[in-house]
Amino acid sequence: QNGGYRITTTIDKAIHTAMQNAVANYGYLVDDNTGQPEVGNVLMDNQTGAILGFVGGRDYQSNQNNHAFNTKRSPASTTKPILAYSIAIDQGLMGSASVLSNYPTNFSNGNPIMYVNSPGTGMMSLKEALNYSWNIPAYWTYRTLREKGVDVRSYMEKMGYEIPEYDIESLPMGGGIDVTVAQHTNGYQTLANNGVYHKKFMI
């Protein structure tokens, strides 16, 4: 009657409420006695990019940052499947059964590439390297992509990532990358959707 717009959102009320309740009831489980760790969470329809629910933080009154959409953090080892392995597989350079080196390796500055307290072991399959999130196989995979001239930047930009430098040796382990939970969820949406990226949306 007033000629206004009707805005429809993708948020599923039941899902969104369940996510808020989970944080309210179990958020304390991430406490480590050094302060109150924050949480951010996004649930997305992998086939469309529609956001079905999200958690912006544990307590908006005490911390008014939206940790799902605004706060950027290093994605650390969750970078490996997206920036290293998926691109190598797409390029036909390896498959899940490919054997990769996990022998002790140093960065160019001489510092060893560590995995917890381990400097490396031996050869292992890509599947095992990914399952246990070993660092050295990811390092060598990314180095191979660079040496073969694969345009990693193009892959990442097509998934909405904004990464300023690609010559960082620790990049596949999250070094030099800051991203929101929503954006990183969108990256994984691409993998779950057979490599087809759909930009996230709520309206």
Please describe what each predicted stretch is.
Residues 1-2, 162:
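Membrane-proximal periplasmic segments of bacterial cell-envelope enzymes
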Residues 2-73, 77-78, 98, 153-156:
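Periplasmic/cell-envelope proteins involved in peptidoglycan metabolism and beta-lactam response
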Residues 3-10, 30, 66-74, 112-119, ...:
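Second-shell loop/turn segments in exported
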Residues 9-17, 73-78, 94, 120-124, ...:
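Soluble non-cytosolic domains of exported or imported proteins
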Residues 19, 49, 73-100, 129, ...:
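Active-site SXXK
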Residues 93-152, 168, 193, 197:
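Conserved catalytic neighborhood of penicillin-recognizing serine enzymes
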Residues 161-203:
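Active-site-proximal helix/loop microenvironment
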